[in-house]
């Protein structure tokens, strides 16, 4: 059996869905541009630099989910996927995913972006499993807090282990495993699989991939 994992943002997508969701909310007038846009950009730069405090960021990013009704959120999300995400889906990424699914492999998208934003994106690719940061909800409304461990850096590895355990599986049961990612933030999970693949990597991951002899590919 083969396990194949895909990062989402800047790997299967030509951009970052979490950042774009924030920009979409700004453009829709859901959040105030003056403050939100600057914070969104600041956190995105910290992510790229590897200095992001994930809990501070999630307090910011999940706030709008708690402030609005599920009906409004779902309506905005539908427009977001149509207007912002579908143009970001890379045809070569679709082909890559389809090839692994067609081979009968166990496939999942593993992303730090929350599952409310990413669930419909993952469905666009036909991937049956999503491992993502989970926003907490109570009585049908989001609370603005995180449920469980954020799916970021070492947390990605933990969340994948938990997901596999829920299926009655473990990494050691797979004859082969691979993970496709663009980011140095994903090194803990890249180091765990048999075959790490750097996809249009950031400079830090590109250097690490060359050092370790990992393949580097482009889906752009």
Regions found by a protein language model. Name each.
Residues 1, 75-78, 82-220:
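C-terminal cap/substrate-recognition subdomain and adjoining C-terminal extension
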Residues 15, 37, 51, 55, ...:
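Electropositive phosphate-/nucleotide-binding environments in soluble metabolic enzymes
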Residues 1-52:
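Active-site neighborhood of HAD-like aspartate-dependent phosphohydrolases
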Residues 18-21, 58, 138-145:
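Acidic/polar active-site rim loop that often engages polyanionic ligands
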Residues 21, 60-61, 72, 117, ...:
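Hydrophobic alpha-helical segments typical of transmembrane helices
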Residues 44-70, 134:
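Short, compositionally biased "basic patch" segments
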Residues 17-23, 70, 133, 146, ...:
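Active-site phosphate-binding/coordination module
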